[in-house]
Amino acid sequence: MAIRVTFTYSSYVARSIASSAGTRVGTGDVRSCFETWVRPRFCGHNQIPDIVDKSPGSNTWGPSSGPRARPASSMYSTIAREILEEGCKSPLVLGMISLMNLTGAPQFSGMTGLGISPFKTSSVIPFLRGSKWMPCSIPATLSTDIAEVDRGGKVCDPKVKLELSDKVSNGGNGWVNKLLNICSEDAKAAFTAVTVSLLFRSALAEPKSIPSTSMLPTLDVGDRVIAEKVSYFFRKPEVSDIVIFKAPPILVEHGYSCADVFIKRIVASEGDWVEVCDGKLLVNDTVQAEDFVLEPIDYEMEPMFVPEGYVFVLGDNRNKSFDSHNWGPLPIKNIIGRSVFRYWPPSKVSDIIHHEQVSQKRAVDVS
C-alpha cells in the first residue's frame, strides 16, 4: 500500500513538472521518473545509493544523452548531505533540492537552453503555497487577491486584506485621561475615600456633610462637600461663595455651641446695603437675579448695613433657611473655608463654585 501511494505521488510530481515545462508526460517519462527516484529509494534498501557523479558529462536527472546532458549541481548535493548528515543520499531528495534551486533561482539559462519555460513552485506542487506560509512574504500593508485550492479541489479567490496601523498613542490618551473620564460608581467611591482620608482634618481642606435643606437645590441633605481653607489667606470672601462657618457669637448667646457649623452663600460683602422687598433680594438698591434660587422670597426685610469685617449670608432655599436675615451679618473670622467640591453621592460628584463674575451680575436697576 505504501509503495502504491508513493508511486502515485511521484507520478503526480513528475506530471506537474512536465506540465509546467510545456511537455506532456507519457508512459516512458513516468517509468523513467520511477526508475530514477522511486526505485532506488524504496526498492534498494540493502544497497548504498550511488554518489552523484561530479564529472562534466554526468546528468543528475537521468542517463547521459550527449549534448542534452546537464552538469550535476554539486553544491546542492553537498547541502543535502550536510542537512541529512550523510543519512540519506537518495536521488529523490537530491532531485527535490535541485528542483527548489531551479524554481527559486533568478536566472533559468539552463532550462531556457532546452526550450523549457520557467515555472513556479505553486504550479509544481499546488498545495505548497509559499506566499501564504512564508512569514517574510507578508508586508506591513498588504491588499491582494490569492487563488487558493482547498482539499476538495475547488478553486476560490478570497480577498485577503491585512492592514497594520502606524498610529502611536500619545500621552493624551494615557491612564490620566482614562481616570478623568471614568464613570464607574465604585471607582468614584474609591477615589473619594482615598481623597477624603488624605484631606480629613488637614490644614488645607476639610470634609463636611449637609444636615438640612437650607441650600436646596444646590446641595441636598446628606451631600458631602470639601471646604478648602487656603484661598481666604490671600483674598477676602466674595459674593456667591458658599462658605462653611462656625456659629457666630449671637447664636452662641442663644444656646448654640461654638463647634456648630453652618453652610450658606454670601450675597453681600462689607459696606453693602441689603434688603428684601416684594419677594426680591436687593443689594445697594439693585435686584439680584440669582439662577440658583427656585422661588421668590416670602418675607420682607428692612435695609441692613454690612459693617467692615462682616459678610451677609443666605441659604439658597431662602424660605427655609436660618441665616443672616434672622441673626444679622456674619463675622469673616468665623468662616472656616469655601465649599468647592461635592464628593458624595458619587452620582452627583461635581464642583459647586458659582462661576458668575461679580462684575457681571445679572442685576436690574430699580426704576
Curated annotation (Swiss-Prot):
Residues passing through the membrane, by range: 185-205
Enzyme class, first EC level, given as a word: hydrolase
Membrane topology (Lumenal, thylakoid): 206-367
Record region (Disordered): 53-72
Membrane topology: Single-pass membrane protein
Source organism, top-level taxon: Eukaryota
Location(s) in or outside the cell: Plastid, Chloroplast thylakoid membrane
Segments of skewed composition (Low complexity): 62-72
Transit peptide boundaries: 1-68
SUPFAM superfamilies: LexA/Signal peptidase (SSF51306)
The keyword Transmembrane helix belongs to this UniProt entry's keyword annotation: yes
Active site positions, chain numbering: 214
Catalytic activity: Cleavage of hydrophobic, N-terminal signal or leader sequences from secreted and periplasmic proteins
A Pfam family recorded for this sequence: Peptidase_S26
This enzyme's EC code(s): 3.4.21.89
Keywords assigned by UniProt, alphabetized: Chloroplast, Hydrolase, Membrane, Plastid, Protease, Thylakoid, Transit peptide, Transmembrane, Transmembrane helix
GO term, biological process aspect, one: signal peptide processing
Main location: plastid
Cellular component aspect of the GO annotation: chloroplast thylakoid membrane
Record GO terms (molecular function): serine-type endopeptidase activity
InterPro entries from the UniProt entry: LexA/Signal_pep-like_sf, Pept_S26A_signal_pept_1, Pept_S26A_signal_pept_1_CS, Pept_S26A_signal_pept_1_Ser-AS, Peptidase_S26
Function: Cleaves the thylakoid-transfer domain from a chloroplast protein.
Similarity remark: Belongs to the peptidase S26 family.
The protein, known as: Probable thylakoidal processing peptidase 2, chloroplastic
Organism for this UniProt entry: Arabidopsis thaliana (Mouse-ear cress)
Higher taxonomy: Eukaryota, Viridiplantae, Streptophyta, Embryophyta, Tracheophyta
